[in-house]
Amino acid sequence: MVKVGINGFGRIGRLVTRAAFLTKKVEIVAINDPFIDLDYMVYMFQYDSTHGKYKGEVKAEGGKLVIDGHAITVYSERDPANIKWGDAGATYVVESTGVFTTIEKASAHIKGGAKRVIISAPSADAPMFVMGVNHEKYDNSLTVVSNASCTTNCLAPLAKVINDNFVIVEGLMSTVHAITATQKTVDGPSGKLWRDGRGASQNIIPASTGAAKAVGKVIPELNGKLTGMAFRVPTPNVSVVDLTVRLEKPAKYDEIKKVVKAAADGPMKGILGYTEHQVVSTDFNGDCRSSIFDAGAGIALNDHFVKLVTWYDNEFGYSNRVCDLMAHMASKE
């Protein structure tokens, strides 16, 4: 099992750790965060307002974070080049600070003994992989990769199924997205993105997202055919993608449902889901899948123009994919 270090113990860092202990696909051996001391790490990992209390045992012992009897080395370095990943036995590093998102910046982890770096965010230059969509294109020559964004992980599997079966001519995506840590609790300054600075719990906030364009990087035949935007809404977790597309091949809505269900039950099982239940956002809190197609929520104007709806736990689904990507990479060593 691949040994992993986590840089940045924020929402994604903690939930990747949680996912790793629940799925046992990778082993967490080290965590670095200059802003959180060991006792605070114990507290933050144990108690979670969104996903509930961690059900196992968490404690500090001998200067290490101990989860379910498993000791994890803790560092508090600001410069990634100074983190001694090698000493802790970590060969892969999850870069989840949100700061070191380019190949050059993320490569600093290699200096401390890491072999590969997985950026848990979109990257301007690192190759992006979405499990179930283009993960087979990964090869051993790559040392720094990106797991793309939570929204790209939701959109890409559905876009792939639709494009493979009916060919997408063009499309627009909106994500109705839960609050994240980058937003403000009350109105405050926010650089050039003035709307983003408005109170998160008080407003529906139109925002930009690169998620749809990023799909063109993971599915090259869709490059230039999709773009999108976001609405930030006052819910703590779980988001939903609305994908409106023009199809080259005519399709009844029932046919679309059929091919999505076949993918969800078959090649994309565990990544793409399918539901005909009368669900709402809370029903997906803690869902491990990347994208759950809501058969009852979509609509068709005609056989060439449809609106498709798919849900995602933007925190936990994504964190599980980070673990899956690392396990896949390790299988290629």
From Swiss-Prot:
GO cellular component: cytoplasm; cytosol; microtubule cytoskeleton; nucleus
SMART domains, per the entry: Gp_dh_N
Positions with a binding annotation for D-glyceraldehyde 3-phosphate: 149-151, 180, 209-210, 232
Record EC number: 1.2.1.12, 2.6.99.-
Biological pathway: Carbohydrate degradation; glycolysis; pyruvate from D-glyceraldehyde 3-phosphate: step 1/5
Subcellular location: Cytoplasm, Cytosol; Cytoplasm, Cytoskeleton; Nucleus
GO biological process: glucose metabolic process; glycolytic process; microtubule cytoskeleton organization; neuron apoptotic process; peptidyl-cysteine S-trans-nitrosylation; positive regulation of canonical NF-kappaB signal transduction; positive regulation of type I interferon production; protein stabilization
Transit peptide listed as a keyword: no
Binding site for NAD(+): 11-12, 33, 78, 120, 314
InterPro entries named among the record's database cross-references: GlycerAld/Erythrose_P_DH, GlycerAld_3-P_DH_AS, GlycerAld_3-P_DH_cat, GlycerAld_3-P_DH_NAD(P)-bd, Glyceraldehyde-3-P_DH_1, NAD(P)-bd_dom_sf
Subunit relationships: Homotetramer.
Family, similarity comment: Belongs to the glyceraldehyde-3-phosphate dehydrogenase family.
Task of the protein: Has both glyceraldehyde-3-phosphate dehydrogenase and nitrosylase activities, thereby playing a role in glycolysis and nuclear functions, respectively. Glyceraldehyde-3-phosphate dehydrogenase is a key enzyme in glycolysis that catalyzes the first step of the pathway by converting D-glyceraldehyde 3-phosphate (G3P) into 3-phospho-D-glyceroyl phosphate. Participates in nuclear events including transcription, RNA transport, DNA replication and apoptosis.
Protein name, as recorded: Glyceraldehyde-3-phosphate dehydrogenase
Species in which this protein is naturally found: Danio rerio
